[in-house]
Amino acid sequence: MPAEGIPQINLDPGAAEGLRVAVISAQWNAEITDKLHAEAIGAARELGASVEDWRVAGALELPVVVAAACKNFDAVIATGCVIEGETEHFRVVCDAVTYGLTRVSLDTGVPIGNGVLTVANHQQAVDRAGGPEAKENKGADSATAAIHAALVLRQIAAVG
Protein backbone atom coordinates (compact mmCIF):
# COMPACT_ATOMS: atom_id res chain seq x y z
CA MET A 1 0.00 0.00 0.00
CA PRO A 2 1.49 3.36 -0.99
CA ALA A 3 2.19 5.95 1.65
CA GLU A 4 -0.22 8.85 2.00
CA GLY A 5 0.34 11.63 -0.51
CA ILE A 6 2.23 9.55 -3.07
CA PRO A 7 0.78 10.10 -6.55
CA GLN A 8 -0.65 7.09 -8.32
CA ILE A 9 0.53 7.03 -11.93
CA ASN A 10 -1.63 4.63 -13.86
CA LEU A 11 -0.23 3.67 -17.24
CA ASP A 12 -1.77 0.94 -19.34
CA PRO A 13 0.33 -2.11 -20.21
CA GLY A 14 2.03 -1.30 -23.50
CA ALA A 15 1.89 2.48 -22.91
CA ALA A 16 5.68 2.68 -23.30
CA GLU A 17 5.78 0.79 -26.60
CA GLY A 18 8.64 2.23 -28.64
CA LEU A 19 10.48 3.74 -25.66
CA ARG A 20 14.05 2.69 -24.98
CA VAL A 21 14.75 2.52 -21.25
CA ALA A 22 18.00 1.87 -19.36
CA VAL A 23 18.11 0.55 -15.80
CA ILE A 24 21.40 1.16 -14.00
CA SER A 25 21.87 -0.07 -10.45
CA ALA A 26 24.53 0.13 -7.77
CA GLN A 27 25.74 -3.15 -6.28
CA TRP A 28 26.25 -2.06 -2.66
CA ASN A 29 23.63 -3.65 -0.37
CA ALA A 30 22.92 -6.28 -3.02
CA GLU A 31 20.04 -7.87 -1.09
CA ILE A 32 18.16 -4.61 -1.61
CA THR A 33 19.58 -3.40 -4.93
CA ASP A 34 18.94 -6.72 -6.67
CA LYS A 35 15.24 -6.33 -5.85
CA LEU A 36 15.13 -2.68 -6.92
CA HIS A 37 16.89 -3.56 -10.19
CA ALA A 38 14.54 -6.45 -10.98
CA GLU A 39 11.42 -4.47 -10.04
CA ALA A 40 12.45 -1.52 -12.26
CA ILE A 41 13.11 -3.82 -15.22
CA GLY A 42 9.84 -5.66 -14.68
CA ALA A 43 7.79 -2.47 -14.49
CA ALA A 44 9.39 -1.01 -17.62
CA ARG A 45 8.86 -4.21 -19.60
CA GLU A 46 5.27 -4.51 -18.39
CA LEU A 47 4.66 -1.06 -19.81
CA GLY A 48 6.08 -2.19 -23.15
CA ALA A 49 9.46 -0.46 -23.09
CA SER A 50 12.58 -1.97 -24.61
CA VAL A 51 14.97 -2.35 -21.65
CA GLU A 52 18.75 -2.64 -21.30
CA ASP A 53 20.39 -2.87 -17.89
CA TRP A 54 23.77 -2.45 -16.25
CA ARG A 55 25.28 -2.62 -12.76
CA VAL A 56 27.87 -0.27 -11.27
CA ALA A 57 29.90 -0.57 -8.08
CA GLY A 58 28.19 2.01 -5.91
CA ALA A 59 25.79 4.92 -5.84
CA LEU A 60 28.51 7.49 -6.57
CA GLU A 61 29.13 5.84 -9.95
CA LEU A 62 25.49 6.20 -11.00
CA PRO A 63 25.46 9.81 -12.30
CA VAL A 64 28.29 9.40 -14.82
CA VAL A 65 26.97 6.09 -16.17
CA VAL A 66 23.42 7.44 -16.29
CA ALA A 67 24.76 10.46 -18.23
CA ALA A 68 26.27 8.14 -20.83
CA ALA A 69 23.01 6.18 -21.10
CA CYS A 70 21.01 9.36 -21.65
CA LYS A 71 22.64 9.65 -25.09
CA ASN A 72 20.85 6.51 -26.30
CA PHE A 73 17.71 6.09 -24.21
CA ASP A 74 14.36 7.85 -23.76
CA ALA A 75 14.40 7.35 -19.98
CA VAL A 76 16.89 6.03 -17.45
CA ILE A 77 16.18 4.47 -14.06
CA ALA A 78 18.92 4.58 -11.41
CA THR A 79 18.58 2.35 -8.36
CA GLY A 80 20.73 1.89 -5.32
CA CYS A 81 20.66 1.79 -1.56
CA VAL A 82 22.60 4.00 0.83
CA ILE A 83 22.13 3.07 4.50
CA GLU A 84 23.13 5.57 7.17
CA GLY A 85 26.19 4.67 9.19
CA GLU A 86 28.16 6.36 11.93
CA THR A 87 29.95 8.96 9.77
CA GLU A 88 29.06 11.91 7.55
CA HIS A 89 29.81 9.75 4.49
CA PHE A 90 26.10 8.89 4.28
CA ARG A 91 25.05 12.53 3.81
CA VAL A 92 27.87 13.22 1.36
CA VAL A 93 26.92 10.24 -0.81
CA CYS A 94 23.17 10.95 -0.67
CA ASP A 95 23.60 14.60 -1.59
CA ALA A 96 26.12 13.90 -4.38
CA VAL A 97 24.01 11.19 -5.99
CA THR A 98 20.76 13.14 -5.81
CA TYR A 99 22.39 16.29 -7.17
CA GLY A 100 24.25 14.32 -9.85
CA LEU A 101 21.16 12.52 -11.14
CA THR A 102 19.11 15.72 -11.15
CA ARG A 103 21.88 17.63 -12.94
CA VAL A 104 22.17 14.92 -15.61
CA SER A 105 18.43 14.95 -16.23
CA LEU A 106 18.32 18.73 -16.56
CA ASP A 107 21.42 18.84 -18.78
CA THR A 108 20.23 16.08 -21.13
CA GLY A 109 16.47 16.54 -21.06
CA VAL A 110 16.10 12.81 -20.41
CA PRO A 111 13.87 11.73 -17.51
CA ILE A 112 15.71 9.86 -14.78
CA GLY A 113 13.83 7.76 -12.28
CA ASN A 114 15.66 8.14 -8.98
CA GLY A 115 15.25 4.79 -7.27
CA VAL A 116 18.19 5.29 -4.93
CA LEU A 117 17.03 4.57 -1.39
CA THR A 118 18.57 6.79 1.29
CA VAL A 119 17.52 5.18 4.54
CA ALA A 120 18.38 5.15 8.23
CA ASN A 121 18.51 1.35 8.55
CA HIS A 122 18.24 -1.98 6.76
CA GLN A 123 14.56 -2.48 7.62
CA GLN A 124 13.60 0.80 5.97
CA ALA A 125 15.33 -0.43 2.81
CA VAL A 126 13.52 -3.80 2.93
CA ASP A 127 10.22 -1.97 3.37
CA ARG A 128 10.81 0.02 0.16
CA ALA A 129 12.55 -2.49 -2.13
CA GLY A 130 9.52 -4.33 -3.48
CA GLY A 131 8.58 -7.95 -3.11
CA PRO A 132 6.00 -9.63 -0.89
CA GLU A 133 7.43 -8.38 2.41
CA ALA A 134 7.76 -4.74 1.29
CA LYS A 135 5.43 -1.85 2.03
CA GLU A 136 6.53 0.03 -1.09
CA ASN A 137 8.19 -0.73 -4.42
CA LYS A 138 10.61 2.06 -5.24
CA GLY A 139 12.18 0.17 -8.15
CA ALA A 140 8.87 -0.07 -9.99
CA ASP A 141 7.80 3.40 -8.83
CA SER A 142 10.94 5.07 -10.20
CA ALA A 143 10.58 3.23 -13.52
CA THR A 144 6.94 4.25 -13.85
CA ALA A 145 7.73 7.88 -13.00
CA ALA A 146 10.56 8.11 -15.56
CA ILE A 147 8.49 6.45 -18.28
CA HIS A 148 5.52 8.70 -17.52
CA ALA A 149 7.78 11.76 -17.80
CA ALA A 150 9.17 10.49 -21.13
CA LEU A 151 5.63 10.07 -22.45
CA VAL A 152 4.69 13.59 -21.29
CA LEU A 153 7.80 14.99 -23.02
CA ARG A 154 6.73 13.24 -26.24
CA GLN A 155 3.28 14.80 -25.94
CA ILE A 156 4.80 18.25 -25.41
CA ALA A 157 7.10 17.79 -28.42
CA ALA A 158 4.14 16.76 -30.57
CA VAL A 159 2.31 20.00 -29.75
CA GLY A 160 5.22 22.16 -30.92
From Swiss-Prot:
InterPro entries: LS (IPR034964), LS/RS (IPR002180), LS/RS_sf (IPR036467). One of its GO terms (cellular component) is cytosol. CDD domains: Lumazine_synthase-I. Its EC number is 2.5.1.78. (2S)-2-hydroxy-3-oxobutyl phosphate binds at residues 86-87, 128. Disulfide bonds: none annotated. Catalyzes the formation of 6,7-dimethyl-8-ribityllumazine by condensation of 5-amino-6-(D-ribitylamino)uracil with 3,4-dihydroxy-2-butanone 4-phosphate. This is the penultimate step in the biosynthesis of riboflavin. This is 6,7-dimethyl-8-ribityllumazine synthase. It comes from Corynebacterium urealyticum (strain ATCC 43042 / DSM 7109).
